[in-house]
């Protein structure tokens, strides 16, 4: 097989591959379907809600751990500038 025949075969095979790809366009094109963008937006809102819930959980865990550490300490004076849950503030803080 001479070099011209070899390059001709490669050219035909590549054209067939391109033709196959053109026959089946990508179904994952987000710019074509606005419902996909709505789904992405909803996912972002869900992630923000999860982040907010996680932050609240961390604050509550922090206040519970401080409460457990200082459960026997009657003279404990909490820092009123810290973020504690309402139950903790009522029980342990004098922030009036």
Curated annotation (Swiss-Prot):
Enumerate the subcellular locations listed in this protein's record, separating them with semicolons: Secreted
Keywords noted in UniProt: Disulfide bond, Secreted, Signal, Toxin
Single GO cellular component term: extracellular region
Q: What residue range is the signal peptide?
A: 1-23
The tissues where this chain's protein is expressed are given as: Expressed by the venom gland.
Q: Does the keyword Ion transport apply?
A: no
What Gene Ontology terms describe what this protein does at the molecular function level? toxin activity
PTM annotation: Contains 2 disulfide bonds.
Please classify the protein's predominant subcellular localization into one broad category: secreted
Family label: Belongs to the scoloptoxin-06 family.
Name the record gives this protein: U-scoloptoxin(06)-Sm1a
Q: Which organism is it from?
A: Scolopendra morsitans
The major lineage groups are: Eukaryota, Metazoa, Ecdysozoa, Arthropoda, Myriapoda
